From Swiss-Prot:
GO cellular component: cytoplasm; extracellular region; membrane
Residue span, Ig-like domain: 41-158
PROSITE patterns for the chain: IG_LIKE
The keyword Iron is annotated on this UniProt entry: no
Annotated protein name in UniProt: V-set and transmembrane domain-containing protein 2-like protein
Cited PANTHER family: V-SET AND TRANSMEMBRANE DOMAIN-CONTAINING PROTEIN, V-SET AND TRANSMEMBRANE DOMAIN-CONTAINING PROTEIN 2-LIKE PROTEIN
Organism: Homo sapiens
Biased composition (Pro residues): 175-187
Top-level lineage group: Eukaryota
InterPro entries hit by this protein: Ig-like_dom, Ig-like_dom_sf, Ig-like_fold, Ig_sub, Ig_V-set, IgSF_V-set/TM_domain
Amino acid sequence: MGAPLAVALGALHYLALFLQLGGATRPAGHAPWDNHVSGHALFTETPHDMTARTGEDVEMACSFRGSGSPSYSLEIQWWYVRSHRDWTDKQAWASNQLKASQQEDAGKEATKISVVKVVGSNISHKLRLSRVKPTDEGTYECRVIDFSDGKARHHKVKAYLRVQPGENSVLHLPEAPPAAPAPPPPKPGKELRKRSVDQEACSL
């Protein structure tokens, strides 16, 4: 009985020594296991497809949260792509979907509307369109450039604005062609001469 007890005590001694060495090598103030996972960059507010009437004011919101906690450079841009509607058939462009790319799509008729730059980890910018017109219809893109890891990363979301005629819009109909001019009335001289001839014939 003494030998097995001695072996068990020896095993417990080595186990205690191992645990003490493990605790000594761990930095003070840290938990035994660090399960922290850094957050991913994402849009916290995205624009949505909408329909407006001519003359109404339209507002689109876009907010972005970066992937790092320390401050870094963020840039948000609003772009207008004229009548670019083929993206609506792509599921990758869901309203809350995030797309990261190193290069922007080329070959599209796009116009930059506004730019806002901040130093931080969050950025937001609202696009306001006053008294929209049918020519304002099209795709609006919110693009964010994220410099959190030292290089530019591009993220963007899109929404389509449809503009319908307003309630007070005047319907312009095609003009009717001008009527043909009426024939001129007969001259008085001819009528008098005809009457005088008739009177002479009666007298004969």
